[in-house]
A protein has these predicted regions:
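Charged, glycine-enriched surface loops/patches
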Residues: 91-116, 133-143
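Short, amphipathic alpha-helical "lid/cap" segments that border enzyme active or binding sites
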Residues: 59, 90, 94, 98, ...
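Substrate-gating cap/lid alpha-helix
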Residues: 120-151, 159
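Structural signal for conserved beta-strand scaffold positions within catalytic alpha/beta enzyme cores
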Residues: 46-49, 115, 147
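Conserved SGNH/GDSL esterase-like catalytic core that processes O-acyl groups on lipids
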Residues: 2-95, 125
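A short acidic, often aromatic-flanked loop/helix-cap motif at beta-alpha or helix-coil junctions
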Residues: 53-56, 151-156
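N-terminal secretory targeting modules
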Residues: 1-20, 27, 32-33, 37-41, ...
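Active-site segments of SGNH/GDSL-like serine hydrolases
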Residues: 77-81, 105-129
Length: 192
């Protein structure tokens, strides 16, 4: 896979720590540098998204492309390519997702994990069920769940001001990252 080779070469240059987006085809084109500049996001941000990421190959790809970065935070946005699997065998999908979360925790005990829902702007019942199960999984595994399923009125300027204000007061989560994860994920996954 050329993506793995590309990410391996980038990982050799990257600083360890920071926040990693681990998602699918939709996430590969997130304009991370531009959003980082526009919202004055601190820390290091890396996008390790794969065109054909599935929950069935996620653990292997995580180990080869994300784990070497020793991330402080991982934003998991997985499921886009797994709708058929979820429709036919939701328990297997959730079992594989839980195994991925456990693998991340075993690789880095202090890594903060956020599970990001799938977008569901058309109110698809299958995606709604998948997101519901992802929320349950996040709760049971003590991960943060970020719901980006519905279009929301979003004012980028007020989000930027709110993030800046909260951080200036010192209200940050217990790790080193300086942005609240929910607002960070909304910024990264809902910019368009």
């Amino acid at each position: 896979m050329t993506e793995i080779k590309k990410y391996s070469a980038l990982n050799d240059l990257a600083e360890k720590g920071g926040t990693v987006i681990f998602g699918g085809k939709e996430d590969k084109d997130i304009p991370l540098c531009e959003l980082r500049q526009a919202f004055e996001l601190g820390s290091n941000y890396y996008n390790r998204s794969f065109e054909n990421l599935s929950i069935e190959n996620a653990a292997e790809l995580y180990l080869s492309s994300v784990a070497p970065l020793a991330p402080e935070t991982v934003l998991l946005h997985i499921g886009e390519n797994d709708l058929d699997l979820f429709a036919n065998n939701p328990d297997k999908f959730l079992e594989l997702y839980r195994e991925l979360v456990c693998k991340i925790k075993s690789e880095s005990r202090d890594c903060y994990i956020a599970i990001v829902s799938l977008k569901n702007y058309d109110n698809d019942s299958l995606i709604a069920k998948l997101n519901e199960r992802l929320k349950y999984l996040a709760d049971s595994e003590r991960c943060e769940f970020v719901d980006v399923s519905q279009k929301k009125v979003w004012n980028p300027r007020s989000t930027k001001d709110a993030i800046s204000f909260i951080c200036s007061l010192g209200f940050v989560r217990h790790l080193k990252s300086h942005e609240p994860v929910y607002d960070l994920a909304r910024t990264l996954f809902c910019y368009a």
